[in-house]
Amino acid sequence: MAIIIPSRLSSTRLKQKPLQLIGSITLIERVFKQVNQAGLEHTYVATDSEEIASVITKVGGKVIFTDSAIPTGTDRTYEAFKLIPNNQNINYIVNVQGDMPFIEPSSILKIIEYLKNSKYDIVTPIVKVDRESVKASSNVTVVVDSAGTALYFSRSLIPNGAEEFLYHVGMYGFRKNALEKFVSLKPTFLEKTERLEQLRALENGMTIGTCLVENVPISVDTEEDLKKAVKFYENISKLGL
């Protein structure tokens, strides 16, 4: 089992996003520390940046350098996976986005549990939310069948007319052969239209299972998101959490 956190220094909406401070600690360090609490031996940050690498190694983390030209987080995850020593013994890979500073380790463990106890190619977490919680265009919703198998992901609110939705949390657990297959596939029409790479898997007949988790994690993509993350940190610090 390996957890890989892709983290690229360049960001279009928030300059040097991984190095932005939340309190006295950078975003990427907070993500790493949360993920590391899952207690798995193979936890890596995959990056193109010496600065990010320095932050992670100073707190005892492991780094794998990947090319800055790699187009997606999943592609970066696979490139990093190939460089893990003795990776032939690793059968499951979890891709955790590097912009969720308060991600709950229990969500990662739940992904792993679902992967091991199902036949899905990919497993990803979801949260039940109301309409007010998913108004932002950056939010992604998903529709599933009665068994929890993902049918479609969208940046639009789906299903249309509903008052409760399934919010998609941007983490993916892959079987090794599924990750290898995914990166071998070309970007698809729906993937490019929605700007959601998981649709590449669905369009090519791969199965994505969903596991229900309790909380929507804060994700930092913009300056406004960063302010919210800082405010959240200040609030939990006051409570001693």
From Swiss-Prot:
Q: Give me any GO biological process, just one.
A: lipopolysaccharide biosynthetic process
Q: Which Pfam families does the entry mention?
A: CTP_transf_3 (PF02348)
Q: Which pathway is this protein engaged in?
A: Nucleotide-sugar biosynthesis; CMP-3-deoxy-D-manno-octulosonate biosynthesis; CMP-3-deoxy-D-manno-octulosonate from 3-deoxy-D-manno-octulosonate and CTP: step 1/1; Bacterial outer membrane biogenesis; lipopolysaccharide biosynthesis
Q: State the compartments where it is located.
A: Cytoplasm
Q: What InterPro entries does this protein's entry cite?
A: Cytidylyl_trans (IPR003329), KdsB (IPR004528), Nucleotide-diphossugar_trans (IPR029044)
Presence of keyword Transferase = yes
Main localization category:
cytoplasm
> Which keywords does this chain's UniProt record carry?
Cytoplasm, Lipopolysaccharide biosynthesis, Nucleotidyltransferase, Transferase
Q: Which GO terms describe its cellular component?
A: cytosol
* Name of the molecule in the record: 3-deoxy-manno-octulosonate cytidylyltransferase
Q: Which organism is it from?
A: Rickettsia rickettsii (strain Sheila Smith)
- Gene designation per UniProt: kdsB
